[in-house]
Amino acid sequence: MNFFHFFKQPDIHQGIAQYQETPGAVLLDVRTEQEYREGHIPGSKNVPLQQLDKMDALAENKDIPLFVYCYSGSRSRQAVSLLQHMGYSNVQNIGGIAAYRGKVER
């Protein structure tokens, strides 16, 4: 891995495609409830980053594939780290909705 690869942002469109192709996967939006209401990716579940560690069981199966996004990719990166610390083993940061050009729900 070269130095600049470390700073490369995830591609949210690739992440959404992977989510759609993965049976049983959960698409997790870690933005605030207000941000979520303003527009979110269809099928996503909202658990704000600030509440993530208070969730007893986001999913009973800690191996379930979780695809995590936020606005820019920063909170989702933090959420992935926290979820891994909580024992979730199949977690992926897919970036931020700011770069998303697909359909959103309100």
Regions found by a protein language model. Give the residues of each.
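Rhodanese-like catalytic fold shared by cysteine-dependent sulfurtransferases
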Residues: 1-18, 22-25, 33-64, 74-106
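N-terminal glycine-rich beta->alpha transition that marks the start or flank
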Residues: 29
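Short, surface-exposed ligand- or partner-binding patches at beta-edge/loop junctions that are enriched
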Residues: 69
